[in-house]
A protein has these predicted regions:
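Nucleotide-activated donor-binding/catalytic signature segment of Leloir-type glycosyltransferases, i.e.
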Residues: 263-265, 271-296
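Acceptor-binding helix/loop patch of EC 2.4 sugar-transfer enzymes
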Residues: 76-88, 136-171, 189
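N-terminal subdomain of nucleotide-sugar transferases
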Residues: 1-64, 112, 245-254
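Nucleotide-sugar-dependent
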Residues: 238, 293-300, 305-326, 334-343
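Carbohydrate-associated surface elements
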Residues: 186, 210
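Membrane-proximal helix-turn-helix segments that form the acceptor-binding/catalytic region
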Residues: 26, 95-106, 126, 140, ...
């Protein structure tokens, strides 16, 4: 039996959020085949661990039913989620992880089991790059262009020492690790290009974010009102103003429609913009729902026809929300800044891309109506095969073999 160790770095795997849905649940599909076992190794800071102890224990019990073992390695509060891992913090970081990774290294040498490490983040991957000897066991699951993201939001200086360090580490990870997973071909191409690395599809694998389609089919869709939906955080990448501006533009031409927003962002970050006088005309047609549990999301999706992902800065990823929209039978509307999603919307004919901010509203509304009528002719079934969680064992088997 093959063994997979999912490595999580000071992130809440127990909150049923992204790590649970995008890392744990897909690997559970392999466990269910009877040919794999799964351990979760979490480097968790002591304050974080103590604060969330009850939730952690509950998740342990739930996953125990599948034979999943969770190992929490307690470390001091260190610069990952709450303090960015700049070069000045590296000695502190290495001090925290060194003994744990060396322990894993010695333990793995004594077994004949076929072992893989699925590394969740750049921060976790760095420790294994430095201290774990057998790099052929490591699958690096990038998820996001972490370095570029921190440059774009101003956390890292483009030519600073921190970026130079991480660029060099990234190249070593790409070359030395067994495989690296990317969630869009544009993301993969951009990362390989900046390091002048030739594409090898067996080593640099394309794996889209998986979604449980059945979860979003639990409530029947009622899209007669042509409502628009946005789900997710509102901050650096997705600003509430860009969604309000879009709806303000089309609202008069679609008088029965609403804009529905489900977000985990705090109300004090949204209300000042939402209450601006420019949005007076649409305010009573906008619903904002805070901290909606994942189990309740299908009821909001079911009220909508279109799913929005409009960003002010360029990004090569394909976000979870884009695939959730597809799973719920919504029509995604993205702009060209959401490059990975825009490419898929065109390739599979499953959404529309707003190429030009000056596009006339009549043109936008006509395109929305056209794709709504023609969606049965799209390549939705083909897209589902590569994104449905329940089909994901077939995608992951060649990677973890």
């Amino acid at each position: 039996m093959k063994k997979i160790n999912l490595v999580v770095f000071n992130e809440p795997y127990w909150d049923k959020g992204l790590i649970y849905s995008q890392n744990i649940l897909p690997l559970l599909q392999l466990v269910k085949t009877g040919k794999y076992s799964l351990d979760i190794i979490s480097f968790t800071s002591l304050p974080f661990f103590l604060k969330c102890y009850k939730e952690i224990q509950k998740t342990k019990e739930e996953l125990k039913e599948y034979g999943v073992v969770i190992k929490n390695y307690p470390v001091l509060f260190y610069p990952t989620r709450f303090m960015l891992l700049r070069t000045i913090f590296l000695p502190f970081y290495f001090l925290n992880v060194y003994l744990f990774i060396k322990y894993l290294n010695r333990k793995d040498k004594k077994t004949n089991d076929e072992i893989f490490y699925s590394i969740r983040s750049y921060q976790a991957a760095l420790g294994f790059l430095k201290f774990y000897e057998d790099k052929s066991r490591i699958i690096f699951d990038t998820r996001t262009d972490w370095i570029e993201e921190n440059i774009n939001v101003g956390n890292f200086k483009p030519d600073g020492a921190t970026v130079k360090f991480w660029r060099n580490a990234e190249k070593q990870m790409l070359l030395k690790f067994r495989k690296t997973l990317f969630i869009s071909d544009l993301f993969r191409d951009a990362v390989l290009k900046r390091h002048s690395i030739k594409l090898d599809e067996n080593k640099y694998c394309l794996v889209y974010n998986p979604i449980n389609y059945e979860h979003f089919h639990s409530v029947q869709n009622r899209d007669q009102d042509d409502n628009f939906l946005y789900t997710g955080s509102l901050g650096h990448w997705n600003n509430i103003s860009i969604y309000l501006d879009f709806f303000l533009k089309v609202a008069d031409k679609m008088p029965s429609s609403k804009l529905i927003v489900c977000t985990g962002s705090p109300i004090h970050k949204i209300e000042p913009t939402f209450n601006l006088p420019k949005y007076d005309a649409i305010r009573n047609r906008v619903e904002i729902h805070y901290s909606v549990p994942y189990s309740e999301l299908p009821s909001f999706y079911a009220r909508c026809t279109y799913g929005l992902q409009l960003m002010s800065k360029k990004d090569t990823r394909v976000g979870v929300k884009f695939i959730e929209y597809i799973a719920a039978n919504l029509i995604p509307i993205v702009n060209t800044n959401v490059m990975g999603a825009a490419a898929l919307a065109r390739k599979y004919e499953i959404g529309i891309v707003l190429d030009d901010e000056t596009e006339e509203v009549d043109s936008i509304v006509n395109r929305l109506e056209q794709i709504k009528q023609n969606r049965k002719n799209s390549k939705l079934a083909e897209f589902r095969k590569i994104t449905d969680l329940n089909e994901f064992a077939n995608i992951l088997k060649p990677i973890y073999s």
